[in-house]
C-alpha cells in the first residue's frame, strides 16, 4: 500500500516537486550566501555533515527526558546520540557536566535563571548599549522584567570593561547572579576577576560565551571553565554547528538543577535532529584543523580592524582579540542603518550596532559590527580581508560623496569575484 506521505507529496516525495515556492526561496537563499560576503558576527557556515544530521529522520522522534530516563519508548538510538554530544562537549571545554537540549542560547540562559534565581532577585550584567545581550538584564527581555537588573558599562575613554566599577556595583547592589558575556565586545574578558568579585558578594557567576565558544575551545580566547559556576553558549557562531544552545558546569548540584530547569521546566521534547548535528559539530571542533581555523578567525579580524583604521575609521577599543570588529561611524556623520543598507546592495552583509553610549535609536545606531568566522570558514585569508576592508571603505566613501549607487555596483562586481574564487559548498 502507498504511504500517506506518498499520497500527499507524490512518489518522489521531493520538496521541489511538492512545494516549489519554498524550494525556490531556499535556492535563492543559497545563491545569496554563495554570492555575498557574510560578515555578520553571529553567523557561520555549517558543514554538510552537520546539515545532514540536522536534516535526518531524527526529526520524527520524540524523546522527553534524558538518556536512559525517557518518557517514550524507542529511544535507544537517540540516547546514544545525545550521550555522544554530552561526552564530546565536556571534552571540548574541559567540564564535568553538560546539557545539550536547550533550543537556543536565550533558553540556555533562562534555564540558568530558573535554576539559580527567584523573581525579584538582583542580577548584574553588561548593558546592551555597551555590548551586552538582551538576556543579560535588558529592559525588553524577561531577564529585565522578572529580576532587578543592574547594568554595568564600559570605560567612557577606552570602551574596555572597567572591572573596578563592576566590583563597586556588585558591592553596592549584592547581586545573586553576575553575568560575564557579550554580543558585541571584541576584547578578552577577565573571568578570574569576575569570579573574585562574585565571591566577594556571594553571587553565582554565569559566563555566557555564545560568541567566543569556538575560540575558547581552540585556545584562542580565555576559558571561564575554571572560574564560572555555569557556562552557556550557542552552538553556531564560532562553534560552527547548528543553531541551538548548551549549558555547562563543574558543579553536580547545579547540574541537577539545570537538568530540571531545561526539562520539564522550560522545554518538552528535545530536538533530536539538532542534538545530532551538535554532536557532529563538537567532533569537528575537537579536530586539530579547528584550532588552525580559529587562529585564522582572530588573525583575520585583527587584519580587518587594522585596515579599516588605516582608512580613517574609528574602531571600538582600538582593535580586537576575537572575531568581532566594531566600527564607530559618528566621526563620519553616518548612521549604521545607512551604511549596512548600502553594503548589502554592494554584496556585503553585516549588521548595524549600537556603540558604547550611543544616542541613536537601536533601529538606527551609530556603528557597525563585523565578524570574520563565516568568511574564514569559506577559506579567506588575511590578504582577502585587506581587500574587504578596502571595499567597505569604498562604500562608505560613496555614501559621503553622494555617489553610492555607482560605487555599490562596482563593489558588488568585486565581491562576486571574491566569492566565486571561494565556494562555500
Curated annotation (Swiss-Prot):
Q: Known catalysed reaction(s)?
A: (6R)-5,10-methylene-5,6,7,8-tetrahydrofolate + glycine + H2O = (6S)-5,6,7,8-tetrahydrofolate + L-serine
Stated EC number for the protein is 2.1.2.1
Recorded GO CC terms: cytosol
Q: Which GO terms describe its molecular function?
A: glycine hydroxymethyltransferase activity; pyridoxal phosphate binding
Which residue positions does N6-(pyridoxal phosphate)lysine occur at? 237
Keyword annotations of the record: Amino-acid biosynthesis, Cytoplasm, One-carbon metabolism, Pyridoxal phosphate, Transferase
Top enzyme class, one word, equals transferase
**PROSITE patterns of this UniProt entry?**
SHMT
Report if keyword Cytoplasm is assigned: yes
Q: Which residues bind (6S)-5,6,7,8-tetrahydrofolate?
A: 128, 132-134
- For the site labelled Plays an important role in substrate specificity, the residues are 236
What are the GO BP annotations of this UniProt entry?
glycine biosynthetic process from serine; tetrahydrofolate interconversion
Q: In which pathway does it act?
A: One-carbon metabolism; tetrahydrofolate interconversion; Amino-acid biosynthesis; glycine biosynthesis; glycine from L-serine: step 1/1
Superkingdom of origin organism: Bacteria
Q: Where is this chain's protein located in or outside the cell?
A: Cytoplasm
Q: Which cofactor does it need?
A: pyridoxal 5'-phosphate
Q: What is its main location?
A: cytoplasm
What binding partners and quaternary form does the record give?
A: Homodimer.
Purpose: Catalyzes the reversible interconversion of serine and glycine with tetrahydrofolate (THF) serving as the one-carbon carrier. This reaction serves as the major source of one-carbon groups required for the biosynthesis of purines, thymidylate, methionine, and other important biomolecules. Also exhibits THF-independent aldolase activity toward beta-hydroxyamino acids, producing glycine and aldehydes, via a retro-aldol mechanism.
HAMAP family per the UniProt record, alphabetical: SHMT
Q: Which family does it belong to?
A: Belongs to the SHMT family.
Full protein name: Serine hydroxymethyltransferase
